[in-house]
């Protein structure tokens, strides 16, 4: 009965202004129940701020709203699907079974996910067109090609918190910013897909499955061999599209001291086998994205440059990235195999670029390149045992290799003088993902 104004509705985030207390109370009471009935298992966090007194100004109300939401997220919500003892449960989720289909006991959440087969809107956002359902991969195994590796990509815009603080002082500007940010992210994803090779785009089913695309977030599952190229193109286009669509808003509100008119993004890529649990792969991708952001902020605290971290999961251990790095990337206290993140731009001092990484990996895809891969693997093994022996063998290999770009690549990659890190581990991991055939 009263007016309701939508300020933001994207990526699981909704902000509304109510001009009627009764309408607000009705939504707060009924909205969580309606969502959990449609999508069992989803949890809803809500908060309300009355725009008066200290919170009369829109930006102050939004700041307080975010604080209250953080409190609500830390409060456990009772499950509506625990069920009673003695009833049959889904073998996969442990929740009460509501249906048997093809021998599988399905709980409410699984039933809802399987029934939600219309992915046309998500396809249109990710690819620019609503693809036919039969073109869309539903089984992760259908995404793979010459080997069993898939990639989970999670990308996230940089510095949105500080940007919203400046833009969010005016609700109309904040609404426009949110809508155009959504457009920029979707267009960047579409351009990234359009830039892929024709043999990738013409695969059946499509070897890329969008999971989340909205706001400044992107999460996709894709075939592993083109994941780095895809995410590099996405980040480049995210910068371009945000400059085109948001440049005037960023300038008007003097968001960046240097007058920057674009946004940037960081990404994490988890390379996993198709049989590896998606949840753990996603957690790793999110952790890698956070690692990339942390390094990028050191380069420019105002607007962190776009970059990506990736990791190839080689075992069945389920642990966070820092523990993986400590276990796998530190052969001794003086050496690290952790060379990333890899940056989009080439003007970041002493930081590797995605372009250089991909060019280096491409050089390994030849008969002579295979010999270099063998030398690099042996050198990495020697580093675990004795750094001095590894250096002796390195010099011997260099003395035997003919002059050329492969010799220069080996020399550059194994030079541990400064910093005491090597790109060899990442190169070999990515080369095996892109070129190794196991099926």
Regions found by a protein language model. Give the residues of each.
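Regulatory and interdomain segments flanking nucleotide-handling catalytic cores
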Residues: 1-439
């Amino acid at each position: 009965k009263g007016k309701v104004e939508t300020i933001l509705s994207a990526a699981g985030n909704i902000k509304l202004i109510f001009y009627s207390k009764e309408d607000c109370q009705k939504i707060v009471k009924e909205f969580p129940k309606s969502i959990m009935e449609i999508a069992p298992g989803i949890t809803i966090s809500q908060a309300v701020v009355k725009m008066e007194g200290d919170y009369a100004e829109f930006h102050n109300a939004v700041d307080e709203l975010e604080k209250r939401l953080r409190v609500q997220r830390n409060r456990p919500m009772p499950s509506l699907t625990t069920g009673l003892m003695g009833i049959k449960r889904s073998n996969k989720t442990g929740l009460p079974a509501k249906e048997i289909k093809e021998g599988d006991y399905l709980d409410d959440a699984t039933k809802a996910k399987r029934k939600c087969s219309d992915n046309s809107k998500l396809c249109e956002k990710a690819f620019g067109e609503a693809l036919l359902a039969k073109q869309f991969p539903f089984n992760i195994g259908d995404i793979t090609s010459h080997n069993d590796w898939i990639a989970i990509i999670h990308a996230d815009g940089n510095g949105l918190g500080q940007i919203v603080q400046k833009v969010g002082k005016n609700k109309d500007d904040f609404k426009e910013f949110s809508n155009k940010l959504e457009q920029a992210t979707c267009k960047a994803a579409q351009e990234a897909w359009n830039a892929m090779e024709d043999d990738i785009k013409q695969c059946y089913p499509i070897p890329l499955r969008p999971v989340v695309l909205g706001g400044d977030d992107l999460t996709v599952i894709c075939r592993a061999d083109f994941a780095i190229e895809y995410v590099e193109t996405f980040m480049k286009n995210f910068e371009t599209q945000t400059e085109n669509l948001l440049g005037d808003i960023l300038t008007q509100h003097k968001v960046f001291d240097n007058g920057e008119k674009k946004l940037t993004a960081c990404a994490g890529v988890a390379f996993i086998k198709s049989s590896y649990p998606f949840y753990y792969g996603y957690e790793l991708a999110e952790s890698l994205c956070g690692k990339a952001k942390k390094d990028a902020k050191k380069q420019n605290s105002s607007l962190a440059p776009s970059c990506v971290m990736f990791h190839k999961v080689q075992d069945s251990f389920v642990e966070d990235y820092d523990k993986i790095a400590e276990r796998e990337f530190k052969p001794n206290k003086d050496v690290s195999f952790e060379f990333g993140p890899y940056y989009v731009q080439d003007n970041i001092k002493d930081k590797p670029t995605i372009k250089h990484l991909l060019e280096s990996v491409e050089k390994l895809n030849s008969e002579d390149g295979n010999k270099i891969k063998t030398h690099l693997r042996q050198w990495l093994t020697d580093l675990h045992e004795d750094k001095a022996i590894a250096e002796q063998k390195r010099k011997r290999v260099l003395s035997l290799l003919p002059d050329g770009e492969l010799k220069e690549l080996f020399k550059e990659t194994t030079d541990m003088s400064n910093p005491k890190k090597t790109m060899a581990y990442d190169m070999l991991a990515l080369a095996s993902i892109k070129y190794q055939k196991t099926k």
